[in-house]
A protein has these predicted regions:
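Cytosolic juxtamembrane helix and N-cap/initiation of the first transmembrane helix
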Residues: 1-16
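Hydrophobic transmembrane helix segments
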Residues: 16-46
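Non-cytosolic membrane-interface motifs at loop->transmembrane helix junctions
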Residues: 38, 99-111
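Core segments of alpha-helical transmembrane spans in multipass integral membrane proteins
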Residues: 43-64, 81-85
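Membrane-embedded alpha-helical segments of multi-pass membrane proteins
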Residues: 51-53, 57, 107-115
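Juxtamembrane helix-break-helix junctions at the cytosolic face
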Residues: 60-77
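Transmembrane alpha-helical segments of integral membrane proteins
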Residues: 86-96
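Membrane-water interface at the C-terminal end of transmembrane alpha helices
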Residues: 114-127
Length: 127
């Protein structure tokens, strides 16, 4: 049963990352909500390549990692480490910047990333 849950989780993680990669590559302007200036070609290239490319790589590992010899446990572990790092750094960066007004957004997103990362870690241990 846990293998099936882990397989579904890893698949959903891959599809989610793929969707986020597609959004980022097709419409980098979506990041203007975060205060990023996307008015120059250079900024859009950086957003597409760094964020979109990262998400595409993560999606590839989640969805095609089995073809590379990665087990479900290893893929869930990779996803866990990734989300735990992203969530922790997001919260620490917001704290460092002292974003009193906007703190709820990075705090909420960071907390969600940490929670999903912990679920992935639990599945990685069970698989």
């Amino acid at each position: 049963m846990s293998d099936r849950i882990t397989k579904i989780f890893v698949g959903l993680a891959g599809v989610g990352a793929l969707g986020f990669a597609a959004l980022t590559i097709v419409k980098p302007e979506a990041f203007s909500d975060y205060g990023l200036d996307v008015n120059t070609p250079q900024a859009r290239i950086v957003i597409r390549s760094l964020i979109g490319g990262f998400e595409l790589a993560l999606a590839g590992l989640m969805l095609l990692g089995g073809k590379l010899g990665l087990s479900l446990q290893q893929r869930a572990g990779l996803f866990s480490v990734t989300l735990l790092a992203l969530g922790s750094v997001r919260i620490l960066a917001a704290t460092y910047e002292g974003l009193d007004v906007l703190f709820h957004q990075p705090l909420g997103e960071g907390a969600l990333e940490i929670i999903v990362g912990l679920i992935a870690a639990a599945l990685a241990r069970r698989a």
